[in-house]
């Protein structure tokens, strides 16, 4: 989406990820309140549209989240479902409202609680009309096949994949919002329980509860609200895959490649300009594949990019500086929103103990959603100041 007028992030909020005994609406409100406070918004009537992303917690989740904030009854509240990209999609739509002049202030929220709502044995299954689901395919199995093929084609080892968990846990060491953090060795990752070979338990994200929220506004409102360090949204792009099940290159992701290409073209920012990236590292192999798909390195050089230390502090681009999904866990509808919230905090130098230096000027987030190829959606966003 090419932005018709400038859009700025005024404030962000997020909750700690993990297991929560409070429901999704409490988590969503906590993140929203933090974002509203950071935006100097003290009256609910100042917000002109709201989008709430959620994956599994039922109907009218947005109204449930926002009713106790005084937002019901005076603004449109739109509920967004897009599997794992729901939170990112909610913020994309809030950005669109401001970009098109439909609102001067809008909020996007992603929230989820699986602890209180998990349907045992059926969680996250795609529709049984999906040919891959009918034959027993699940996400972990699909990514395991991608890992096996990638290792066969490139010579990558189990230790290479484990390096990503080690890196991301190290990034999250001092992050109070992360669920899993602290030093872990390559040996501990490789020797943890096998889930779907070659992926072990420590190479798969945990299914978590949590929330994230982002308030966006026009340039005029930035001045009225007195935002000291507004973050400009340089671009925000959503693409969906075609409906087919034909053979494909499972070591790539053409939807992500197309989304990233469109984002760079519309924003005028190239991958070489990006300082930090939060991507969809639901599994170690996913992060490795997305290095190339997002253009962080040339095709065929993702493994070299990792081995050379280019995805961590002191490298070309710090990938998953908050610790990624491998450290936060993955609350389906909330992850995309939390990625953006964490990136904005990095750009505002608000991450003591895990701050990227020098302070990032350009950040990119990437989240995917869907089961089979036909239902996949990709969301990528570039922000700068």
Curated annotation (Swiss-Prot):
Binding positions (CoA): 19, 121, 193, 204-205
pH dependence: Optimum pH is 6.4 (for benzoylsuccinyl-CoA formation).
Molecular functions (GO terms): acetyl-CoA C-acyltransferase activity
UniProt site (Increases nucleophilicity of active site Cys): 330
Function: Component of the BbsAB thiolase complex, which catalyzes the thiolytic cleavage of (S)-2-benzoylsuccinyl-CoA to succinyl-CoA and benzoyl-CoA, the final step of anaerobic toluene metabolism.
Similarity annotation: Belongs to the thiolase-like superfamily. Thiolase family.
Protein name (record): Benzoylsuccinyl-CoA thiolase subunit BbsB
């Amino acid at each position: 989406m090419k932005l018709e007028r400038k859009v700025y992030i005024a404030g962000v909020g997020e909750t700690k990820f993990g297991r929560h005994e409070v429901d999704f609406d409490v988590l969503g409100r906590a993140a929203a309140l933090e974002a509203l406070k950071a935006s100097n918004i003290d009256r609910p009537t100042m917000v002109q549209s709201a989008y709430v992303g959620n994956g599994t917690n039922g109907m009218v989740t947005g109204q449930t989240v926002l009713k106790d904030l005084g937002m019901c009854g005076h603004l449109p509240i739109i509920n967004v479902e897009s599997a794992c990209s729901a939170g990112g999609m909610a913020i994309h739509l809030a950005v669109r409202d401001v970009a098109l002049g439909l609102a001067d202030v809008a909020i996007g929220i992603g929230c989820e609680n699986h602890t209180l709502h998990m349907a045992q044995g059926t969680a996250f299954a795609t529709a049984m009309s999906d040919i891959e689901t009918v034959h027993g395919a699940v996400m972990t199995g699909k990514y395991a096949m991608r890992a096996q093929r990638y290792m066969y084609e490139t010579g990558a080892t189990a230790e290479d994949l484990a390096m990503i968990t080690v890196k991301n846990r190290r990034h999250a060491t001092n992050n109070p919002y992360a669920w899993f953090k602290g030093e872990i060795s390559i040996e501990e990752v490789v020797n943890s329980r096998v889930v779907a070979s070659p992926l072990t338990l420590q190479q798969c994200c945990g299914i978590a509860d949590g929330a994230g929220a982002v308030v966006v506004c026009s340039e005029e409102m930035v001045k009225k609200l007195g935002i000291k360090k507004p973050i400009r949204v340089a671009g925000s792009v959503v693409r969906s895959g075609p409906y087919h099940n034909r053979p494909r290159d499972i070591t790539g992701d053409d939807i992500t490649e197309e989304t990233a290409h469109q984002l760079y073209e519309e924003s005028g920012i190239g991958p070489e300009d990006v300082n930090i990236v939060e991507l969809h590292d639901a599994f170690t192999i996913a992060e490795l594949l997305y290095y190339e798909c997002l253009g962080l390195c040339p095709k065929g050089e993702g493994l070299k990019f990792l081995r050379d230390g280019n995805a961590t502090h002191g490298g070309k681009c710090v990938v998953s500086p908050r610790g990624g999904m491998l450290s936060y866990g993955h609350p389906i509808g909330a992850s995309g929103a939390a990625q953006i919230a964490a990136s904005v905090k990095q750009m505002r130098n608000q991450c003591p103990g895990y701050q990227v230096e020098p302070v990032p000027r350009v950040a990119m987030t990437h989240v995917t959603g869907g089961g089979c190829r036909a239902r996949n959606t990709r969301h990528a966003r570039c922000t700068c100041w």
